[in-house]
Amino acid sequence: MNAINWKKLLLPNIPYLFFVYLFDKVGQAVRLSPGADLSGKVLSLGEGFSMAFANPLPSFAPMDLLIGIAGAVLIRLMVYFKGKNAKKYRKGIEYGSARWGTAEDIKPYTDPVFQNNVLLTQTERLTMNSRPKQPKYARNKNILVIGGSGSGKTRFFVKPNLMQMHSSYVVTDPKGTVLVECGKLLQRGGYRIKVLNTINFKKSMKYNPFAYLRSEKDILKLVNTLIANTKGDGEKAGEDFWVKSERLFYCALIGYIWYEAPEEEKNFTTLLEMINASEAREDDPEFQSPVDLTFERLEEKDPEHFAVRQYKKFLLSAGKTRSSILISCGARLSPFDIKELRDLMETDEMELDTIGDRKTALFVIISDTDDTFNFVVSILYTQLFNLLCDKADNEYGGRLPVHVRCLLDEFANIGQIPKFEKLIATIRSREISASIILQSQSQLKAIYKDNADTIAGNCDTTLFLGGKEKTTLKEMSEILGKETIDSFNTSENRGREVSHGLNYQKLGKQLMTEDEIAVMDGGKCILQLRGVRPFFSDKYDITKHPNYKYLSDYDKKNTFDMEKHLRRRPALVKPDEPFDYYEISEADLQEDTDHE
């Protein structure tokens, strides 16, 4: 049983001791008043009060005490029932208390140093400090940005935040325009520039997912991401059995490559060669392909090997079934038939695990019209989040030294990042944040289904730049809430005599209705921060930023030349490959820079 809270029980009733005293004195006054009957005592009650209050102490006569206690109990019951039946009035907010936020509302969430903020609107900013002096003002830096085509997602959100230069950045860059316009600025700020270009492989740095495999768990994550974002063979590709069989086969081959292959062969090219060397014959159950023989030798060497255990499960299927699985695997990895893609993923220059160590800007250039190679981007983001979380936990006590902001423009075109709904809930404490940029909320639901609401719920900030998609408009209007407005009606009755009437009343109205949001001025936006009233503000004016003069928007001389940047990067030299070595003085390097 719960212990009685005497403090809570007694403190509210202390004032009623006064009524015990008061009624006790009344009882004493009546008792001391002269008179043989009640009417006589009432007439001389004044004299009785004089005698009763001659001594300020309460009367301890039993009847006086009883009257005192009874009177106090009566008053307590009257107060109780009056409070219980009291009408609750909320004057001015009867139908809703929604209103637009003010400068005072956002002030506790803003850093006084301009550069230490996330830029949201022209007047609202959010501090990058994840541990403010008052914990109640702490907000994660995950942001959901929604804006239809042409609403300015890049100009009014991505570019202003790149100009802040307070973090490492991972930017999804449709068409590659952000890199061209902001690259020189970031170089000036001391950033390393990394580029993965899935539109033009020749203008990309190398990315090899095998370089980031640290354990068997990483192999499973790589396989799951690959399967989630590629297509197998026809109808069978979507069936659970075939997908599970493919997963076993991929895990076996990648496990073998990771454990047994030389360093220079740990890539997708080797995986394709092993798949091409695999064969299953329905009419010859005893037939063994070169891959079968390879795993047989490995089993003799280590029967408990991860790759062997996976491959033996794969071999449990019949020859005809294995043949179908191999066809599906070939179809799924058909993009790797392109030599440029194989070359791109042969070695690695991305250094994904170091992005949280020093200021780095990684630009992921994707096509906004073709998603053929977006599975590569999905693999990169999956590995990036896992690598950074592991490094924060294992090397930095849970927090990266440099915050990593992922500006995920055209998030719907990236593909599916497995378990993203869990990642976005946990990356905050590691000094990682994600800005999910969409054209409409329905895009998120199309990819992540039931987990879309979980992902959106883990974004403390929502920025709506404009759009006309019905679901988004409805949700925005509902979240803004209702305000209470005054209304009056006039009436006119015509009969023998004309009479007029005027009726005032209060009504509830959405702070902004769906149609009002749909026709919102192109220079306005709606900002919602958890625990704060929404803001109806101007979009950020990029030309007012102190670093705007370093963008190519301001001066074409600031245009970033990706090809020149790639030529300057250190060459990748394979083992035993001859190469030339030169020494360049600092003066020569400065002279070359001046000529540019």
Region locations from a protein language model:
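A short glycine-/small-residue-rich loop at the edge of a beta-strand within enzyme catalytic domains
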Residues: 107-109, 114, 375, 411, ...
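Conserved long hydrophobic alpha-helices within structured protein cores
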Residues: 113-120, 375-383, 476
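Low-complexity, polar-biased intrinsically disordered regions enriched in Pro/Ser/Thr/Gly
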Residues: 126-132, 231-241, 486-505
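P-loop NTPase motor domains
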Residues: 25, 139-432, 447, 457, ...
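Conserved ATP-driven motor cores of ASCE-family P-loop NTPases powering translocation/secretion/packaging/pilus
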Residues: 424-526
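General secondary-structure edge motif
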Residues: 98, 125, 129, 141-142, ...
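Basic- and hydrophobic-enriched, low-structure N-terminal and domain-boundary segments
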Residues: 1-151, 155-158, 482, 493, ...
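Short secondary-structure boundary micro-motifs
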Residues: 128, 153-154, 223, 337, ...
